[in-house]
C-alpha cells in the first residue's frame, strides 16, 4: 500500500523570538503549548507562509495591528520578523521516500509601508543527516552564528553532490512542484486556487465554521468537470471555427464575386473602348472619303445658289415698289369701310331712337290724362276729408260740452250754447244775419239746391275741359312733327309747310325705291372692273416671268405649247421616278437584309464564343449539333460514374466519422443505453474503470474481458435483480459484475496468459479463449490510438472525396454549360457567317448609292423645266377666261355713271329713312293745323272757379244741416225733461260721432291712397318727360353726327366697301406673301450660301484634320495591337459582337464599367493608380495596361495548390466549384459537431449523480464524528429548482425551443443562457453576457446547492450555523468539513498526479482549549483514521495523550528576546524523553 507523505519538521530562521529553531512534527498531532505571546501563532504563521507564500492572501489577524501601520500591506507578517534575512522551511518526505525541503526567504523592506520580500525555493536530494538549520546558518563561534543569504545558500547547496536547489519566480511554479512531489493535495494553478487553499488553512487555524468555505462548498468539494467543459468548449470552438470558415468561404465567395465582377467590368471597360476605337478607326476612314465627296458637292451647290440669289433679289425689288401703292389703297378702303359701318350703326341708332320717341309720345299723352283725372279725384277726396274732419271736431266738441254740463248739472245750458254757436257759424257761412232756428230748415233746402246746381255746372265745365285738352294735344303733336321735319317756324305757317312736306315725301320715297337695283348693277360692274384689273396684272406678271411681251391673241397658242411640253416632261419624270423607285427598293431590301444580318451577327458571334469555350473546356471540336448532343451523352455517363464513386467514398467517410464519434464517447461506452443503465443500477461501466489502461496493456485487458468488456460494475448484484425485471431498452447481452468501483481489480477471473492470447476460466467446465485484438479499443489510450488512425484514414478519404466532388461539380458545370448552349445557341451556332454576307451586301449597296446619285443629277434638270412649264400653264389658265374683259374699254365709264345715280337715290332713301315716320304720323292729323285752340286757358280758369263755388256751397249746406239738427236745443221745458232729453241726445251724439269718425277714417284712407297713387302718376309722368327729352336730344345729336360723317348708309354700302377692302387686302397679302417668300428665300439663299461657305471651310478643315487623325490613329492603333498581341489578350478584348453597337452605347458601357471599377479597386492602390491613368482618352494603350494589370493581380491571388490554372476566368470557375464543395462539407460537419440539448442534459445529470454518490461516500467517513452535543456531521447536496427545470426542458421539451439551438447566430452556451432566461424571467442576470451565463450553466456545480448539517442532541439534523453551535462544536464541525474538503481534493487530483504518490495531509487548530477532552480525543481519532497531521496551539492546561507537545516560553535575556522550547513525545511508562533540538536557541547575532 502506498504510504502517505509527511511533514517532518518546520524550521524558523531569524523570526521574532526564534533565531534558528526546528520543530519536528509528529505523524499525527503536534501541540504547541504556551501562554499568551509565547510564539504559538508565530510558529503557525511561519508554517503557513512557507506553505502559501502569497502576500495578497497572508493575513494574521491577531497581530495585524501590532506589526503594521494603517497603510501597511504585510497583514501582520512584518512584525513577526527580525531585521535581516529570514527563512521558513518545511522538511517533508513523500510517498516515494524522497526528502524535499521547501521554504521561503523573507526580508523586511525598508520604508513606511513595512513591506516584506518573499522568495520561495525548494531543495531536493538532501541527505537525511543534514539538518535544515545547518544549511542556512554558519557558526561563527560557540555563542554566535550567521544567517546565510539566499545566493550563498544556493552556492553551498550546488557544492553538495546530488542536491538540487530551485528558486522560483512565481508562486504557481512553486506550488506546481509541491503538488507533483506530493506535498500539497491540489494543483494550485491560479490565484483563485491559492485563495481557496489559504481560506481552508485559515479556517482550520482559527477554528469554527468558516463562512467563506460554507458559502462556496461547491468550489471546495465538487471537482471542476474540466473534461465536460473542455468538450463543450472544443465543440463550440469547432463550431465557431466551422462558422468562421463558412464565413470565410462566404467572404471568399464575395471575393470570387468581386474577382468575377472585376474581370467582367474590366473586360467591359477595356473591350468596349477597344472595339470603339476599332470602329472609330473604320468610321474615320469612311468619314475622310465622305468629307472629300461632300467638299466637291458643296462647291457645285454654292455656284448654283449664287445664280439663284441674283434672280430673287431683282424680283424682290419689284414687289417692294408695288407694295407701297397697294398699302395706300388698302388703307383708304379700310377707312371707307369703317365710315360706312359707323354710318350704319348711327342710322340704326336713329331708327331705334325714333321708334322709342313715338312710343314715349303715346305713353306721355296717356299719362297726362291719367294725372289730370287723379288730380280731380284728389281734390274731391280732400274736400270730403276736410268736411268729415270738421264734422268729427264739431261732434267731439258738442259731446265734450255735453259731458261737462251733465257733470255739473248744466248740460242744457251747454247744449243751448252749442246750438247758438252752430247758428252763428251758419249765419256767417251763409251770409244770413236774420237766420233763426225755425227758418234754418227752409234755408237748408235752398242751399242744398244751390249745392246741386254748382255741382252740375262744375261737371259740365270738366267735360268741356277734357274736349279742349284733346284738341290742344293733337295740334301740339302735329306742330311738333312739322318742326322736327322742317325746323322752327311760326304756328300759323304750320299748315302750308306741312302740305309741302307731304308732297316732297312722296317724291323722295319713289327715288328711294331705286337704290337696291342701282346698287346691284354697280356691284356687278365694279366686280368686272376689278377682274379686268387683275387680268391685266396677271398678264404683266406672266410676261415678266416668261421674259417677253405677248399679245392677247398669242396667249392661246402659247398655252397649247406649254401643255405639250409638260406632257413630255411628265413622261420623263414618271419614268425617272419608276427607275428611282426600283433602285431605292433594291437599296431598302439590301439595307433591310443588312440590318437583319447585323441583328443576327451578335447572336451568332455569342454562339461561336460559347462553342469555342466549350471546345476549349472539353478539348473537342464540334462541327454540327449532332456532335454536341453526342458529347453531352458521354458527359452524362462520366458524371454518373463520378457520382457513384463519390457516394461510395462519402459513405466510407461517414462510417469513419461515426466510428470516431462512437470512440470519442466519455468512458469508452459505445452504446448510450449502457450509460443510462449504469446510472439506473448505481454502478460504473467497466470501460470507465479501465479508462486509464495503457496502450500496451489494452490488448490484454480487451482479451481478458472479451464480450464483457462493456459490463457494468455494481456494488451488489442482489440489488440489481429488481431492475432487471421487464428491462427491454438494453443491448442483447448485458454483463453485470459485482465489485467496488473505487477499488476494482481483475481478480474476478482465473486467467492463463498465452502468446498474444489469454484463456479465461469462467467456470470449471467453461473456458474462453480470446486472442489479443489487432486494434484494441479498451482504454482511453487504445481508443485515442484508433481515433488517430481513423483520423488519418478520414483525411485520405476527405481528400479523395473533395477531389471527386470537385470533378463531379466540374462535370456538372460543364453539363450545365452544354445545356445552356443547347438551349440558347444551338439553333444558330452552325449557321453561315453573317459577317461575310454583310460585306458582300455592303459592296452592292455602294454601287446602288452611286447609281442613285447620278440619276438624281439627271432628273434635277428635267424637274426644273417641268416646274417652269407647269407654272406658266397655271398662269395662263387664270388669264384666258378673262380675255373678253381685257378687250372691254368702256367698263370704267359705265361704273362712274351708275355710281352717280346711286348717290341720288341713296340721298332720297336717307331722307325717307330720317323723316318717314314723322311724315306718316303727320298725314292723318295735318288738318288740325288749320285752327289754333287759344281759349283753352280761359276754360281752365272757369273750371277752377266752378270747383271753388261747389266747395263753398257744400260747406254752407253742412252748416245749415248742423243748425237744423240742433234745433231741439233751443227750447227745454224743465229739468226732468232736460235730463231725459240729455240722455237721448248723448246717445245720438255718440252714434253720430262714431259715424263721423268712421267717415273721417274712410276719407283719410281714400285721401292717403289717392295721394300715393297721384305721386306715382306724377313720378311716372316726370320719368316719361325726362326720357322723352333725353332721347329727343340724343336723336338730334345722332342726326348731326350722321350728317358730319358724310357717307350714305344704305344696305349694300358695307358689303361693297368690304369687298373692295378684301380685294385690296388679298392683293396686298399676295404681294406681301410673295415678298416675304422672296425675302425668306433670299435670306435662306444667303444663309445657305453662308452655310455652304462655312461648310466648305469646315469640310476642308475637317477633311485635312480627318486625314491627319487617320494617320495619327494608325500609329496609336499599331501600338495598341502590338501590346494586345504581346500580352495575349486579343481573344478577351476583340469581342466582335460589340462591333455592332454604336459609339455612344460603347462609351456608355465603358463609363458604367469605369464607375463600377472605381468602387471595386478603391482598396487596391496599384490598380487604382493604373485605372486612374487609363482614364486618359488620348492614351488607349493605358486601358490595355490596366487590363493586363487586372489579370496579373488576379493571377497572383490564385492558389496554385487548389486551382491549377493561370487564367483568372478559369480560376474563378474552379474556385466557385471548390467553394461550393467546401460549403457543403462544412455545413454537414457543423451538423455533426452540434451536440443535442438532450445529450447536454444527460451529461450534466450523470455528473451530478456521480458527485452526489461521491459526497455520500464522504459523508460515511463523518458518521462517527462527534463533538459535544454533535453526534454526526453530513453534507446535503440538492439540485436547484430553476436548474432542475432547465434540465427537464433540455431533455423532455427541447423541441419547443429549437429556435434557440438551431440558430446560427447563437453558440450553444448563448442558446442555453437564452433558454434559462426564458424559463426564469424573474431572475435578474445583471450585466453578464449570455455567453458567460451559458458557460456557467455548462458547469454542473452551478446546478447544486450544498449545506452542512449536524445531528445535535434532541434537535436531530439541523443546519450547521455558528449561532446554533457552541464554540467547541463549531470548531469540531468545521474541522470535519475541512478534512472532507482535503480528502475530496485528493480524489479529484488523483489522475493528475503520479499513482505512486499519496499527498501530505496537515491542518491547524489555534486556541484548542475551547475543545473538551472528548472532542480532542475525537480529533486524534480522526487524524489517525485519515492519516492526517494536525498542529494544535493551546494554553498550558492541554496535555494530550498522544502526539508530540512543545512547551513554549518567551524570555528576555540581556535585552534580547527569545523563546525557550521544550518538546515531549506522548505519555509512556518510561520517563518522557527529551526530543532532540529542545534546548534553548543560541543568542542571535547582532
From Swiss-Prot:
Main location: cytoplasm
Transferase among keywords: no
Keywords associated with the record: ATP-binding, Cell cycle, Cell division, Chromosome partition, Coiled coil, Cytoplasm, DNA condensation, DNA-binding, Nucleotide-binding
Annotated residues for binding of ATP: 34-41
Annotated stretches, region: Flexible hinge: 666-783
Coiled-coil segments: 334-418, 444-480, 509-603, 835-923, 977-1115, 1209-1266
Keyword ATP-binding: yes
GO biological process: cell division; chromosome condensation; chromosome segregation; DNA replication
Record localization: Cytoplasm, Nucleoid
Complex formation: Homodimerization via its hinge domain. Binds to DNA via its C-terminal region. Interacts, and probably forms a ternary complex, with MukE and MukF via its C-terminal region. The complex formation is stimulated by calcium or magnesium. Interacts with tubulin-related protein FtsZ.
Domain comment, as recorded: The hinge domain, which separates the large intramolecular coiled coil regions, allows the homodimerization, forming a V-shaped homodimer.
Family note: Belongs to the SMC family. MukB subfamily.
Reported function: Plays a central role in chromosome condensation, segregation and cell cycle progression. Functions as a homodimer, which is essential for chromosome partition. Involved in negative DNA supercoiling in vivo, and by this means organize and compact chromosomes. May achieve or facilitate chromosome segregation by condensation DNA from both sides of a centrally located replisome during cell division.
Entry protein name: Chromosome partition protein MukB
Amino acid at each position: 500500500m502506498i504510504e502517505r507523505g509527511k511533514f517532518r519538521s518546520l524550521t524558523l530562521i531569524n523570526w521574532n523570538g526564534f533565531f534558528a529553531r526546528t520543530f519536528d512534527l509528529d505523524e499525527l498531532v503536534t501541540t504547541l503549548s504556551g501562554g499568551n505571546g509565547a510564539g504559538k501563532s508565530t510558529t503557525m504563521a511561519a508554517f503557513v507562509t512557507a506553505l502559501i507564500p502569497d502576500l495578497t492572501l497572508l493575513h494574521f489577524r491577531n497581530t495585524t495591528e501590532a506589526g503594521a501601520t494603517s497603510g501597511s500591506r504585510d497583514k501582520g507578517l512584518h512584525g513577526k520578523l527580525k531585521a535581516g534575512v529570514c527563512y521558513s522551511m518545511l522538511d517533508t518526505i513523500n510517498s516515494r521516500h524522497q526528502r524535499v525541503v521547501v521554504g521561503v526567504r523573507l526580508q523586511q523592506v525598508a520604508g513606511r509601508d513595512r513591506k516584506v520580500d518573499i522568495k520561495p525555493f525548494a531543495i531536493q536530494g538532501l541527505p537525511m543527516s543534514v539538518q535544515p538549520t545547518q544549511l542556512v546558518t554558519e557558526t561563527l563561534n560557540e555563542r554566535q552564528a550567521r544567517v546565510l543569504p539566499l545566493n550563498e545558500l544556493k552556492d553551498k547547496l550546488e557544492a553538495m553532490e546530488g542536491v538540487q536547489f530551485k528558486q522560483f519566480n512565481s508562486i504557481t511554479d512553486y506550488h506546481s512542484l509541491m503538488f507533483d512531489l506530493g506535498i500539497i493535495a491540489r494543483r494550485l494553478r491560479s490565484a483563485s486556487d491559492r485563495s481557496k487553499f489559504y481560506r481552508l488553512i485559515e479556517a482550520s487555524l482559527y477554528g469554527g465554521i468558516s463562512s467563506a468555505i460554507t458559502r462556496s462548498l461547491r468550489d471546495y468539494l465538487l471537482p471542476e468537470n474540466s473534461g465536460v467543459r473542455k468538450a463543450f468548449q472544443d465543440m463550440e470552438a469547432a463550431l465557431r471555427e466551422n462558422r468562421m470558415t463558412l464565413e470565410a468561404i462566404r467572404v471568399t465567395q464575395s471575393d470570387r464575386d468581386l474577382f468575377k465582377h472585376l474581370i467582367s467590368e474590366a473586360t467591359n471597360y477595356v473591350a468596349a473602348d477597344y472595339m470603339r476605337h476599332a470602329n472609330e478607326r473604320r468610321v474615320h476612314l469612311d468619314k475622310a472619303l465622305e468629307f472629300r465627296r461632300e467638299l466637291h458637292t458643296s462647291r457645285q451647290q454654292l455656284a448654283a445658289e449664287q445664280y439663284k440669289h441674283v434672280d430673287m433679289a431683282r424680283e424682290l425689288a419689284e414687289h417692294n415698289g408695288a407694295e407701297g401703292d397697294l398699302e395706300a389703297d388698302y388703307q383708304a378702303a379700310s377707312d371707307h369701310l369703317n365710315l360706312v359701318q359707323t354710318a350704319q350703326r348711327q342710322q340704326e341708332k336713329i331708327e331705334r331712337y325714333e321708334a322709342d320717341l313715338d312710343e314715349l309720345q303715346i305713353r306721355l299723352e296717356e299719362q297726362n290724362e291719367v294725372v289730370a283725372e287723379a288730380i280731380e279725384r284728389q281734390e274731391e277726396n280732400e274736400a270730403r276729408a276736410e268736411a268729415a274732419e270738421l264734422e268729427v271736431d264739431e261732434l267731439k266738441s258738442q259731446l265734450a260740452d255735453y259731458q261737462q254740463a251733465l257733470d255739473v248739472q248744466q248740460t242744457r245750458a251747454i247744449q243751448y250754447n252749442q246750438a247758438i254757436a252752430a247758428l252763428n257759424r251758419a249765419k256767417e257761412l251763409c251770409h244770413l244775419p236774420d237766420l233763426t232756428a225755425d227758418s234754418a230748415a227752409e234755408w237748408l233746402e235752398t242751399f242744398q239746391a244751390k249745392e246741386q246746381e254748382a255741382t252740375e255746372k262744375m261737371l259740365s265745365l270738366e267735360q268741356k275741359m277734357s274736349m279742349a285738352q284733346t284738341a290742344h294735344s293733337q295740334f301740339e303733336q302735329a306742330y311738333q312733327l312739322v318742326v322736327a321735319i322742317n325746323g322752327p317756324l311760326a304756328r300759323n305757317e304750320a299748315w302750308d309747310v306741312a302740305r309741302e312736306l307731304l308732297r316732297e315725301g312722296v317724291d323722295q320715297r319713289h327715288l328711294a325705291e331705286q337704290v337696291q337695283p342701282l346698287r346691284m348693277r354697280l356691284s356687278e360692274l365694279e366686280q368686272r372692273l376689278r377682274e379686268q384689273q387683275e387680268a391685266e396684272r396677271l398678264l404683266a406678271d406672266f410676261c415678266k416671268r416668261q421674259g417677253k411681251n405677248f399679245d392677247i391673241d398669242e396667249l392661246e397658242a402659247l398655252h397649247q405649247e406649254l401643255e405639250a411640253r409638260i406632257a413630255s416632261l411628265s413622261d420623263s419624270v414618271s419614268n425617272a421616278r419608276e427607275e428611282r423607285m426600283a433602285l431605292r427598293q433594291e437599296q431598302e431590301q439590301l439595307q433591310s437584309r443588312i440590318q437583319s444580318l447585323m441583328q443576327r451577327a451578335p447572336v451568332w458571334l455569342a454562339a461561336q464564343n460559347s462553342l469555342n469555350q466549350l471546345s476549349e473546356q472539353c478539348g473537342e471540336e464540334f462541327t454540327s449539333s449532332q456532335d454536341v448532343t453526342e458529347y453531352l451523352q458521354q458527359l452524362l455517363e462520366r458524371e454518373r460514374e463520378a457520382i457513384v464513386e463519390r457516394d461510395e467514398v462519402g459513405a466510407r467517410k461517414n462510417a469513419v466519422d461515426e466510428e470516431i464519434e462512437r470512440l470519442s464517447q466519455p468512458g469508452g461506452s459505445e452504446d448510450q443505453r449502457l450509460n443510462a443503465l449504469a446510472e439506473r443500477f448505481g454502478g460504473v461501466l467497466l470501460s470507465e474503470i479501465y479508462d486509464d489502461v495503457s496502450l500496451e496493456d489494452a490488448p490484454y485487458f480487451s482479451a481478458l474481458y472479451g464480450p464483457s468488456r462493456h459490463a457494468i460494475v455494481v456494488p451488489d448484484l442482489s440489488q440489481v435483480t429488481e431492475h432487471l425485471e421487464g428491462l427491454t431498452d438494453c443491448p442483447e447481452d448485458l454483463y453485470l459484475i459485482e465489485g467496488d468501483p473505487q477499488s476494482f481489480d481483475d481478480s474476478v477471473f482465473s486467467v492463463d496468459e498465452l502468446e498474444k492470447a489469454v484463456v479465461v476460466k469462467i467456470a470449471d467446465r467453461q473456458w474462453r479463449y480470446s486472442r489479443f485484438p489487432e486494434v484494441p479499443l479498451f482504454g482511453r489510450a487504445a481508443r485515442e490510438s484508433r481515433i488517430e488512425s481513423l483520423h488519418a484514414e478520414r483525411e485520405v478519404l476527405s481528400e479523395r472525396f473533395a477531389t471527386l466532388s470537385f470533378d463531379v461539380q466540374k462535370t456538372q458545370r460543364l453539363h450545365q454549360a452544354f445545356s445552356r448552349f443547347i438551349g440558347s445557341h444551338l439553333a444558330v451556332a452552325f449557321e453561315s457567317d453573317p459577317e461575310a454576307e454583310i460585306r458582300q451586301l455592303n459592296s452592292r449597296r455602294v454601287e446602288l448609292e452611286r447609281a442613285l446619285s447620278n440619276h438624281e443629277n439627271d432628273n434635277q434638270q428635267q424637274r426644273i423645266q417641268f416646274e417652269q412649264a407647269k407654272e406658266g400653264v397655271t398662269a395662263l389658265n387664270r388669264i384666258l377666261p378673262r380675255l373678253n374683259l381685257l378687250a372691254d374699254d368702256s367698263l370704267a365709264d359705265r361704273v362712274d355713271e351708275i355710281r352717280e345715280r346711286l348717290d341720288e337715290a341713296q340721298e332720297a332713301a336717307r331722307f325717307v329713312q330720317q323723316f318717314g315716320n314723322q311724315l306718316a304720323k303727320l298725314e292723318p292729323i295735318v288738318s288740325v293745323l288749320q285752327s289754333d285752340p287759344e281759349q283753352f286757358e280761359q276754360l281752365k280758369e272757369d273750371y277752377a272757379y266752378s270747383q271753388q263755388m261747389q266747395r263753398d256751397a257744400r260747406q254752407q249746406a253742412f252748416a245749415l244741416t248742423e243748425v237744423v239738427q240742433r234745433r231741439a236745443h233751443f227750447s227745454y221745458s224743465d229739468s226732468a225733461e232736460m235730463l231725459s232729453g240729455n240722455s237721448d241726445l248723448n246717445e245720438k251724439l255718440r252714434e253720430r260721432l262714431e259715424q263721423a269718425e268712421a267717415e273721417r277714417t274712410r276719407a283719410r284712407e281714400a285721401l292717403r291712397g289717392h295721394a300715393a297713387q297721384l305721386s306715382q302718376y306724377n313720378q311716372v309722368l316726370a320719368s316719361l318727360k325726362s326720357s322723352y327729352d333725353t332721347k329727343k336730344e340724343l336723336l338730334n345729336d345722332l342726326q348731326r353726327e350722321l350728317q358730319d360723317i358724310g357717307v350714305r348708309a344704305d344696305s349694300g354700302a358695307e358689303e361693297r366697301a368690304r369687298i373692295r377692302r378684301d380685294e385690296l387686302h388679298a392683293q396686298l397679302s399676295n404681294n406681301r406673301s410673295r415678298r416675304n417668300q422672296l425675302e425668306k428665300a433670299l435670306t435662306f439663299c444667303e444663309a445657305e450660301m453662308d452655310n455652304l461657305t462655312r461648310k466648305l471651310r469646315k469640310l476642308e478643315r475637317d477633311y485635312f484634320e480627318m486625314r491627319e487623325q487617320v494617320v495619327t490613329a494608325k500609329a496609336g492603333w499599331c501600338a495598341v495591337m502590338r501590346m494586345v498581341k504581346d500580352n495575349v489578350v486579343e481573344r478577351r478584348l476583340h469581342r466582335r459582337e460589340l462591333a455592332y453597337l454604336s459609339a455612344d452605347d460603347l462609351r456608355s458601357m465603358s463609363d458604367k464599367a469605369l464607375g463600377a471599377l472605381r468602387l471595386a479597386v478603391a482598396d487596391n492602390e496599384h490598380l487604382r493608380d493604373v485605372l486612374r491613368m487609363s482614364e486618359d482618352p488620348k492614351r488607349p494603350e493605358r486601358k490595355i495596361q490596366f487590363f493586363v494589370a487586372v489579370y496579373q493581380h488576379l493571377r497572383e491571388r490564385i492558389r496554385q495548390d487548389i486551382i491549377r490554372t493561370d487564367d483568372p476566368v478559369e480560376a474563378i470557375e474552379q474556385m466557385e466549384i471548390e467553394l461550393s464543395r467546401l460549403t457543403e462539407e462544412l455545413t454537414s460537419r457543423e451538423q455533426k459537431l452540434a451536440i443535442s440539448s438532450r445529450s447536454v442534459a444527460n451529461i450534466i445529470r450523470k455528473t451530478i449523480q456521480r458527485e452526489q454518490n461521491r459526497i455520500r461516500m464522504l459523508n460515511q467517513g463523518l458518521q462517527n464524528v462527534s463533538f459535544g452535543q454533535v453526534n454526526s456531521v453530513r453534507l446535503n447536496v440538492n439540485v436547484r429548482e430553476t436548474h432542475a427545470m432547465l434540465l427537464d426542458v433540455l431533455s423532455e421539451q427541447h423541441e419547443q425551443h429549437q429556435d434557440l439551438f438551431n440558430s446560427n447566430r447563437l453558440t450553444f452556451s448563448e442558446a442555453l443562457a437564452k433558454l434559462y432566461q426564458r424559463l426564469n424571467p424573474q431572475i435578474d442576470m445583471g450585466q453578464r453576457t449570455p455567453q458567460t451565463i451559458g458557460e456557467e450553466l455548462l458547469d454542473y456545480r452551478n446546478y447544486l446547492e450544498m449545506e452542512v448539517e449536524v445531528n445535535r442532541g434532541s434537535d436531530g439534523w439541523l443546519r450547521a450555523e455558528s449561532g446554533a453551535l457552541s464554540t467547541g462544536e463549531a470548531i469540531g464541525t468545521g474541522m470535519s468539513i475541512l478534512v472532507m474538503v482535503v480528502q475530496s481534493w485528493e480524489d479529484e487530483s488523483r489522475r493528475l498526479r503520479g499513482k505512486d504518490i499519496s499527498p501530505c495531509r496537515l491542518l491547524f487548530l489555534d486556541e484548542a482549549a475551547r475543545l473538551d477532552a472528548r472532542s480532542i480525543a475525537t480529533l486524534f481519532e480522526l487524524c489517525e483514521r485519515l492519516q492526517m497531521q494536525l498542529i494544535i496551539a493551546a494554553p498550558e492546561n492541554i496535555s494530550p495523550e498522544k502526539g508530540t507537545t512543545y512547551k513554549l516560553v518567551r524570555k528576555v535575556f540581556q535585552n534580547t528576546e527569545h523563546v525557550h522550547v521544550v518538546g515531549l513525545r506522548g505519555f509512556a511508562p518510561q520517563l518522557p524523553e527529551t526530543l532532540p533540538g529542545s534546548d534553548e536557541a543560541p543568542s542571535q547575532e547582532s
